Curated annotation (Swiss-Prot):
Forms a 10-stranded antiparallel beta-barrel structure able to accommodate a hydrophobic ligand in its interior. In fact, this fold hosts the heme group, which is located in a wide surface cleft. Heme-binding protein able to scavenge peroxynitrite and to protect free L-tyrosine against peroxynitrite-mediated nitration, by acting as a peroxynitrite isomerase that converts peroxynitrite to nitrate. Therefore, this protein likely plays a role in peroxynitrite sensing and in the detoxification of reactive nitrogen and oxygen species (RNS and ROS, respectively). Is able to bind nitric oxide (NO) in vitro, but may act as a sensor of peroxynitrite levels in vivo. Its EC number is 5.99.-.-. Keywords: Heme, Iron, Isomerase, Metal-binding. Binds 1 heme b group per subunit, that coordinates a highly solvent-exposed Fe(III) atom. This is Peroxynitrite isomerase 1. Disulfide bonds: none annotated. A motif (GXWXGXG) lies at residues 69-75. Pfam families: THAP4_heme-bd. Heme b binds at residues 186, 213.
Amino acid sequence: MTSDASQDGPDAVAGSGDRAVAAAAERAKLTAARNIPTFDDLPLPADTANLRHGANLHDALLALLPLVGVWRGEGEGRGPHGDYRFGQQIVVSHDGGDYLNWEARSWRLDEDGQYEEPGLRETGFWRFVSDPEDDPSESQAIELLLAHSAGYVELFYGRPLTQSSWELVTDALARSRSGVLVGGAKRLYGIIEGGDLAYVEERVDADGGLVPHLSARLSRYAG
């Protein structure tokens, strides 16, 4: 099958690129002025999800810079009772330290795309492994530590695949007495066409294999 791009020729590709750049610039006029709310009476740097404001991003986090911001959109999930749609907001912020703050919360959508009920929620931190005792080949390993509202804590390790995509795999998982029983996961995040943040998550099922669990495409809301 021949793609539309090859049929239309280089001019069409260039035109599409120009339109995408123009659309991104227009969105940036709105998102550039937005940031997360903070209290201004604390004696330490405030969290910011906008690289134009607040503390400078720590040099160790430059490979994660595209993630910083507030992202909103919709996705699809697969649970024990079948497939479902959800809305989601992800906030990625920093205070100048050598880690990123991560907060993701979602809500179930009904057949009409309207809010139905609260969904999954997680909070945690991204950083790069920098232990001098580690193997030098591990110097660019990403560490993601998450606490889930469903009652478990999860530790991921991974690597940047490109300047705008990152892959992580569960290394350890601990469940509370009230927590749901889940298997490990594999996640792939990436900045895609139009500047959106997209991701897919697969989780280990009862048979021990990775199966699709979550996927979403989120647009930048702030930052």
